[in-house]
Amino acid sequence: MDVNFLLSALPEPYAAFRPIVDVMPAIPVFFLLLAFVWQASVGFR
């Protein structure tokens, strides 16, 4: 998808939240890493 289309699709009142919206697709990856770190801390039981 075109980046300009994604940025223009966000309504103006929500322009302040644009950086958060840009990070949102990576959140599931953080949960995957969190699960790995958690299992490493408990010794992969």
UniProtKB/Swiss-Prot annotation:
InterPro entries: PSII_PsbK (IPR003687), PSII_PsbK_sf (IPR037270). It is found in: Plastid, Chloroplast thylakoid membrane. The chain crosses the membrane at residues 20-40. GO terms for biological process: photosynthesis. Residues 1-8 form a propeptide. GO terms for cellular component: chloroplast thylakoid membrane; photosystem II reaction center. Keywords: Chloroplast, Membrane, Photosynthesis, Photosystem II, Plastid, Reaction center, Thylakoid, Transmembrane, Transmembrane helix. Pfam families: PsbK. Coiled coil: none annotated. The keyword Ubl conjugation does not apply. It is a single-pass membrane protein. The keyword Acyltransferase does not apply. Belongs to the PsbK family. PSII is composed of 1 copy each of membrane proteins PsbA, PsbB, PsbC, PsbD, PsbE, PsbF, PsbH, PsbI, PsbJ, PsbK, PsbL, PsbM, PsbT, PsbX, PsbY, PsbZ, Psb30/Ycf12, at least 3 peripheral proteins of the oxygen-evolving complex and a large number of cofactors. It forms dimeric complexes. One of the components of the core complex of photosystem II (PSII). PSII is a light-driven water:plastoquinone oxidoreductase that uses light energy to abstract electrons from H(2)O, generating O(2) and a proton gradient subsequently used for ATP formation. It consists of a core antenna complex that captures photons, and an electron transfer chain that converts photonic excitation into a charge separation. This is Photosystem II reaction center protein K.
